[in-house]
């Protein structure tokens, strides 16, 4: 697929690789007109794409070749603005501003909102990261825990909550830890077994925030690429080091599908909070499923990643919208009569006639 690729600054090196390959193929330096492998289709032709230049952060993404061709046909250059290393947030990727649309079951009717550019963690927060939070007194600094904490509908004090947020040995820490630390040789595994409140406290300590569903899904997908991301992600039944499954998101993040579930800010009508992406023991469909848990839940796959945003208060309020999903109460329905059933059933009947197939060309 022929496409026009430009960057700011010019002179950046362009590479691509097939999704199941570890080898990057060099294409040339910007500006350039080149051909990239793929299929002229919105649903097929995905490749990993990378632009690099000394003293600038690499731009990497999962991109759709059909999308690239459509831009080329419209005479729109693929323009990539690289970020100087001096302005890069450590271990984070920049997501450009623009419209954020949700390709998530039950949430497709939510408004499209426009976001400013923002930074999101390239990897899930690791055990080693969370250990620093604990070692620097994260569970002892009440100012990091400014959200109301409730258990079974009852508001509990911060001191009482700290007695709940303990590891398997009774020390403060994730439910999957013991003796105040993680399992041996798992420093680069995602921290899991944390409640929403623990994730939120860590984000405050790190001078970041948890992502809204809009910030999270914009970083995860351009246009619903779950069919190529989910099968290549960690839904294996056991956790893995972050980045071990070599599949990129739309803007170069790892493990947004699988490995650890990831807490978000959005409240749900039932008191839950959004938790996204699915964990290593979930089905692949969790990546695009509208899922939530009670914020005090500390299930073994509950993890998170953080963002740094520059949104105004109004935009953040829109992104952090209350999720009100419809739940049908089947017990409230009464059986219909046979007459009504037969009318509906008749809509699905067809004439069982011979197909009479013919071979036109062998």
Task: For each feature predicted by the language model, list its residue ranges.
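A residue-level signal for beta-strand positions that form part of recognition/binding surfaces
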Residues: 2, 92, 112, 117, ...
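A short, amphipathic beta-strand motif
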Residues: 2-8
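Short catalytic/ligand-binding loop motif for oxyanion handling, primarily in non-cytosolic enzymes
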Residues: 128, 218-220, 314-316
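A short glycine-rich, aromatic-capped structural motif
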Residues: 15-33, 38-164, 168-169, 192-198, ...
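Functional-site microenvironments in short loops/helix caps that host divalent-cation chemistry
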Residues: 95, 160-163, 171-296, 300
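Solvent-exposed coil/turn segments that connect beta secondary-structure elements
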Residues: 10, 54, 98-100, 280, ...
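Short beta-strand elements bearing conserved aromatic residues within extracellular beta-rich modules
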Residues: 12-14, 304
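Surface-exposed recognition segments
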Residues: 111, 137-138, 142-153, 238-239, ...
């Amino acid at each position: 697929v022929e496409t026009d690729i430009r960057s700011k600054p010019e002179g950046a090196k362009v590479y691509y690789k097939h999704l199941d390959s570890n080898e990057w193929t060099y294409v040339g330096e910007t500006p350039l007109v080149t051909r990239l492998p793929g299929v002229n289709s919105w649903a097929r032709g995905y490749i990993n794409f990378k632009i690099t230049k000394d003293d600038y952060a690499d731009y990497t993404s999962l991109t759709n070749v059909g999308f690239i061709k459509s831009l080329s046909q419209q005479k729109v250059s693929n323009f990539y603005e690289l970020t100087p290393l001096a302005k890069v947030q450590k271990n984070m990727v920049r997501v450009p501003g623009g419209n954020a649309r949700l390709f998530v079951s039950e949430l497709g009717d939510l408004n499209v909102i426009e976001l400013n550019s923002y930074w999101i963690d390239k990897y899930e927060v690791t055990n080693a990261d969370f250990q620093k939070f604990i070692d620097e007194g994260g569970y002892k600094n009440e100012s990091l825990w400014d959200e109301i904490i409730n258990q079974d509908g009852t508001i509990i004090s911060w001191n009482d909550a700290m007695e709940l947020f303990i590891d398997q040995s009774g020390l403060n820490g994730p439910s999957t830890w013991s003796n105040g630390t993680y399992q041996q040789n798992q420093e680069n595994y995602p921290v899991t077994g944390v409640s929403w409140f623990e994730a939120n406290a860590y984000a405050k300590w790190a001078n970041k925030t948890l992502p809204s569903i809009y910030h999270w899904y914009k970083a995860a997908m351009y246009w619903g690429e779950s069919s190529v991301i989910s099968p290549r992600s960690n839904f294996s039944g056991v956790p893995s080091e972050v980045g071990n499954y070599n599949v990129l998101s739309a803007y170069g993040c790892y493990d947004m599908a699988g490995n650890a579930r990831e807490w978000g800010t959005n409240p749900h009508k039932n008191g839950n909070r959004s938790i996204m992406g699915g964990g290593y023991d979930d089905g692949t469909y969790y990546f695009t499923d509208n899922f939530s848990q009670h914020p005090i839940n500390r299930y073994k796959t509950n993890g998170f990643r953080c963002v740094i945003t520059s949104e105004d208060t109004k935009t953040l309020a829109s992104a952090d919208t209350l999720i009100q999903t419809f739940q049908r109460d089947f017990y409230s329905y009464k059986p219909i009569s046979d007459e009504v059933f037969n009318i509906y059933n008749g809509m699905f009947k067809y004439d069982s006639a011979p197909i009479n197939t013919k071979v036109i060309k062998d």
